[in-house]
Amino acid sequence: MKFFASCAKGLEYLLADELLALGASKATATISGVNVEGELRDAQRAVLWSRLASRVLWPLSEFDCPDEDALYAGVAELPWDAHLSVGHTLSVDAHVSGTAITHARYAAQRIKDAVVDTMRRQGLERPSVDVESPDLRLNLSLRKGRATISVDLGGGPLHRRGWRMAQNEAPLKENLAAAVLMRGGWPRAYADGGGLLDPMCGSGTLLIEGALMAADVAPGLQRYGSDLPSRWRGFDRNGWQQLVSEARERDSVGRAALKQVIHGSDMDPHAIRAAKENAQVAGVAEAIWFGVCEVGELQTPPQATGVVVCNPPYDERLAADAALYRRLGDTLQCAVPQWRASLLCGNAELAYATGLRAGKKYQLFNGAIECALIVCDPIAVPRRTPLAAPTALSEGAQMVANRLRKNLQKFKKWRAREGVECFRAYDADLPEYSAAIDVYQQADGDRRIFLHVQEYAAPATIPEADVRRRLNELLAAAREVFEVPAERVALKSRERGKGGSKYGRFEQRNEIVHVREHGALLRVNLFDYLDTGLFLDHRPLRGTMAQQSRGRRFLNLFCYTGVASVEAAVAGAASTTSVDLSGTYLQWCADNLALNGLAGSKHKLVQADALAWLEAERAHFDVIFCDPPTFSNSARAEDFDIQRAHVRLLRAAVARLAPGGVLYFSNNFRRFKLDEEGVAEFAQCEDISPSTIDPDFERHARIHRAWRLTA
């Protein structure tokens, strides 16, 4: 069985590891959560023990939902008497995107109506609504026409541990605090005899969470006490009581052995008073020392090593905050130089202001605020580039840097909303700096940034010296803005009329980087070939197809490295078939599938000429993707010209559609003209090109065209 654990953006990989450690069969990180394979007991264990999850959602039903009537009908089909007891209360949380239903509250109301009407028709008492503390809390996820109705097994946000009685302004959520501690290596440091220090502790969230973690206290134990998290009729009450009994035994042993190695201070006496009250309620007051002092007066703890955790304040007064962050960095280097630090900073600029060299950087979200988490190990290692002496950029390079920063700000909300980690940051925005800059963020390890720079051929009238200078200025600007060394910048040249050079090898690095898109892990090679293995412009189309492929058969023609197949499979496709003439690309596709644990008979790879294969094949598919090359002259198949052959190709593909199936056809030939009359003989065809272009490709929206065909 599959269920979903949601979390704050940036915690997905940590949460996946945590759920696997708790016993889940499989955990796959996706946007703002993790898809989990396991039994109901695994989900209930996550409710009790997960320090990172926001909610644990157990699915009841999933169905196509093009409009509000379909939503009502899909909910009304469920046997609500098997889920909700007479006299119990109900609440619905809804999340909608990319659908005809645009208001979450309205969607939630339609679900309540469907539940109430269904129970009335069965002659049962109408359930009441209780928004604060319902017996059954339902969750709707409605995305791109697909609805999932789930039970919120935890009954609400899991970050509420039950110990927070007093708080300072803008407290840090407990699950985000747990992430800061885990990234900083606190569990291992405590086991090795190290200490924990927060010099700006506020109401004590980081320290209390750290103490409970060290004492092996289940996060849900105090939250629920003797109550059940949910009164859903399918909840395994006996299994829950067994989990709670085991947790209480571990709690008793862990608290008795808890060492007094945790130290917190703050310049605000009211904050320290709140921290002490919270620690008392949490039962860890004896394990934490609290004191009132300014950050510059910090005393060195008795432990030789340990972890500094801190969430320094940040607001609109960047200059004042930068001075505070600099003082924090200076103090830590003097007081605890051999300790590790895990600092949750307001943004990358404030992180830089500490003067500390970050061995690792992570992007996290504190509510809606994008934050930079830096991990320094040890604190004493100086940063290579002094804060006061950044590399000076030329006037031209500064123009490029300014444009890059402007674009990053422009894309910020969109990237956060859609979970985009690989994107085009610049596309010849300044004509004299004619290149494209693509950003690839590593999905594993320390989440490093790589840049893929494609230099466009300059007109012959421009002197070669000017071309070289401008390229060097562009590269200097990109390296500064993204803070990447030269060895993580791949430079390519795209030129016309160079015979077979377009697909030749560039370097012999054989360096594979794992990236993530739509929840799928993908292998890219940024250095060795002109193309990387991932066409970023097709991102929205791949997302649409993945959503529509759940429980359906997906066919990928001219599959290249199989990214669309992998994303469809990760989204829950019943099967995928990937066809390409290149054995190299099919092996790449196989590697991508294996990377996501998807290798097997459900995912078929076919080495063949796609057109010939279509005309001989008899199987049918529900979703087909056809993205052919403009030209192909392989020795193993007849020459292919998309303009000349597209009607024949599309006719053969439409013939393989199952009833109700859909074919997506795309190509990047700028002079391509669809034979509308020819296609109309066998299919209905709609140009959907505008909807397949994300904000990072809007400057050159003709990078591809796309059509939706149905029989």
From Swiss-Prot:
Domain THUMP: 42-153
Enzyme class: transferase
Keyword entries, A-Z: Cytoplasm, Methyltransferase, RNA-binding, rRNA processing, S-adenosyl-L-methionine, Transferase
EC number: 2.1.1.173, 2.1.1.264
Catalyzed reaction equations: guanosine(2445) in 23S rRNA + S-adenosyl-L-methionine = N(2)-methylguanosine(2445) in 23S rRNA + S-adenosyl-L-homocysteine + H(+); guanosine(2069) in 23S rRNA + S-adenosyl-L-methionine = N(2)-methylguanosine(2069) in 23S rRNA + S-adenosyl-L-homocysteine + H(+)
Pfam families reported for this sequence: Methyltrans_SAM (PF10672), RlmL_1st (PF22020), THUMP (PF02926), UPF0020 (PF01170)
Top-level taxon of the source organism: Bacteria
InterPro entries xref list: 23SrRNA_methyltr_KL, DNA_methylase_N6_adenine_CS, RlmKL-like_Mtase, RlmKL-like_Mtase_CS, RlmL_1st, SAM-dep_methyl-trfase, SAM-dependent_MTases_sf, THUMP_dom
UniProt signal peptide: none
One of the record's GO molecular function terms: rRNA (guanine-N7-)-methyltransferase activity
CC terms in the record's Gene Ontology section: cytoplasm
NCBIfam families given in the database record: PRK11783.1
Family classification: Belongs to the methyltransferase superfamily. RlmKL family.
Protein name: Ribosomal RNA large subunit methyltransferase K/L
Naturally occurring in which organism (per UniProt): Xanthomonas oryzae pv. oryzae (strain KACC10331 / KXO85)
